[in-house]
Each structure stands twice: as C-alpha cells, then as structure tokens.
A protein has these predicted regions:
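Vicinal oxygen chelate
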Residues: 1-7, 29-86, 93-124, 133-138
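A conserved hydrophobic helix/loop-capping motif in glycosyltransferases and polysaccharide synthases
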Residues: 9-11
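Short Gly/charged-rich anion-binding patches and loops
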Residues: 17-18, 93
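Conserved active-site tyrosine of GNAT-family acetyltransferases
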Residues: 18-23, 98, 126
Length: 138
C-alpha cells in the first residue's frame, strides 16, 4: 500500500537560479543538495516538516542525451511540463509579499472561486505555479 508522496520533480534550466527563486522569493527551504559525479540531487520543500520534497531536475547528462535535453528545454520554457500547487492561509497577503520579494511573472492575481482563493505565477523558467487558499467546506 502506498502511504504518501515522497518526492515530485520539476524541470528547470538552472538549478542555482531555481534554488534562489524557490527559497528566497517563494519562501520554501532547501532539502537535499548532494553531488554525485556530474549529477546534483537538489530538492526544496515547504518549511517546517518532513513533507513532500520537490526535486529540481535539469535536462542533460547524466540523465538525458543532448537531443532529449534540447527537447526538454524547449518544453520547459513553454510551461508544458506540469507545475506545482501550494496551499497558503492568506493568498492576498502572500501575493503582496511575493511582489515585495521581486516576483513579477504572475498569471493571475488572487481570485475568489467556489473552492477558495487562488493565484498563478511562473518560475523563471516558465513552470506554472498555483497557490491556493482553500475555502470552507460547505
């Protein structure tokens, strides 16, 4: 029986730039940062606990040949490889904080829906990110 999701992955074009964005702009924390030969295992996570980590993967060796890496880089910049959804207790407050931290690529300001308030943005590479303040069940 599966008991929880441990690690999910997203592709980025530069791991250091991604780490800076996710930690210093979004407020996440670095999880693992381990090098093994040419490979760098780098994860981020929501602060405060042993929850699901997000592995920041970069196209290229040793995981991909150059042709595959080139295709992945093109898909990343189109925002076509999936994305992330985070929860917050205060979507509007977080939106203001993100703007103060220099986040500019918002795809949607905080908007109320029947399920709660959410907003959209993209990381520096084009990956879509949704942030949801869930509404009351009813």
């Amino acid at each position: 029986m599966i008991t929880r999701l441990n690690i999910a992955s997203i592709y980025v074009l530069d791991k250091d730039e991604a780490l800076d964005f996710y930690v210093n702009k979004l407020g996440l924390e670095k999880g693992n940062d381990v090098r093994q030969g040419d490979y760098r295992w780098l994860t981020i996570r929501v602060p405060g606990g042993p929850g699901t980590e997000v592995s920041l993967e970069q196209p290229g060796l040793p995981l991909h040949d150059e042709a595959t890496a080139a295709q992945l880089r093109e898909l990343i910049t189109k925002g076509a490889l999936g994305g992330l959804v985070f929860n917050t207790d205060d979507a509007q407050g977080l939106y203001e904080t993100l703007k103060e931290r220099g986040v500019t690529d918002f795809t949607q300001e905080p908007t109320e829906h029947f399920y709660g308030t959410d907003m959209g943005l993209r990381d520096p590479f084009g990956n879509p990110i949704r942030i949801l303040q869930q509404g009351k069940a009813g």
